């Protein structure tokens, strides 16, 4: 088994999908959480000067959260079984990533610093919030319909096996639901899917014991 080190700030943020994949697979890794004060000195050492970044066997470096997530999903069996299934897992995951990305941009400052006040007035917060709300209006109905296409939406996104797509549904909506508890009130299939992820035999212990952060 390779050795893994996941580098990211002490947030769930863009690295949480990767942490959830490690938990779902039961694979050990070094969860290196970088303090914002350390980041300035480290930034130029990182590929693309960004995190998260996954190190494998202290030799290979993979930047970009979704590239890391797809790699781990393929390695651990949480991607599709064929190209068509992989495409479905990918587009569902990317749709939820769009929601998470627009949400984080409302609160993101720079160099890993997040503004925890809700809403955070950074001079253009109204524009960013409008963009996030429009993204939700565009994507959530589509995700509900997409889920219903598989077994009536009563299992996971790909059927009876949990995949990266289901984990993205959970982690991408975690903070938005904290801000607006009724966000999924019109999407019962998505609500139920998040419940299945939460009660999964590998995910339930992880979600109860993980480091508690605001984002």
Curated annotation (Swiss-Prot):
S-crystallins are structural components of squids and octopi eye lens. Contains relatively little if any GST activity. Lens. Gene3D superfamilies: 1.20.1050.10, Glutaredoxin. The keyword Zinc-finger does not apply. It comes from the Eukaryota. InterPro entries: Glutathione-S-Trfase_C-like, Glutathione-S-Trfase_C_sf, Glutathione_S-Trfase, Glutathione_S-Trfase_N, GST_C, GST_superfamily, S-crystallin, Thioredoxin-like_sf. One of its GO terms (molecular function) is structural constituent of eye lens. GO terms for biological process: glutathione metabolic process. Residues 82-215 form the GST C-terminal domain. Keywords: Eye lens protein. Residues 2-80 form the GST N-terminal domain. Disulfide bonds: none annotated. It comes from Enteroctopus dofleini (North Pacific giant octopus). This is S-crystallin 1. The keyword 4Fe-4S does not apply.
């Amino acid at each position: 088994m390779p050795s893994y080190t996941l580098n990211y700030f002490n947030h769930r943020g863009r690295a949480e999908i990767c942490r959830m994949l490690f938990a779902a697979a039961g694979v050990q890794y070094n969860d290196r959480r970088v303090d914002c004060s350390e980041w300035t000195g480290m930034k130029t050492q990182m590929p693309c000067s960004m995190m998260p970044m996954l190190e494998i066997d202290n030799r290979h470096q993979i930047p970009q959260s979704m590239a890391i997530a797809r790699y781990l999903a393929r390695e651990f069996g949480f991607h599709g079984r064929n190209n068509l299934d992989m495409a479905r897992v990918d587009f569902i995951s990317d749709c939820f990533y769009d929601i998470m990305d627009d949400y984080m941009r409302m609160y993101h400052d720079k160099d890993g610093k997040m503004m925890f006040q809700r809403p955070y007035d950074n001079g253009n917060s109204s524009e960013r919030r409008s963009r996030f709300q429009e993204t939700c209006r565009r994507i959530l109905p589509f995700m509900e319909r997409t889920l219903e296409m598989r077994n009536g939406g009563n299992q996971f996104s790909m059927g009876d096996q949990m995949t990266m797509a289901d984990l993205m549904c959970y982690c991408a909506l975690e903070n938005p639901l904290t801000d607006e508890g009724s966000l999924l009130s019109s999407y019962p299939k998505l609500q139920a899917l998040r419940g299945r992820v939460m009660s999964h035999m590998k995910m339930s212990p992880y979600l109860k014991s993980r480091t508690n952060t605001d984002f």
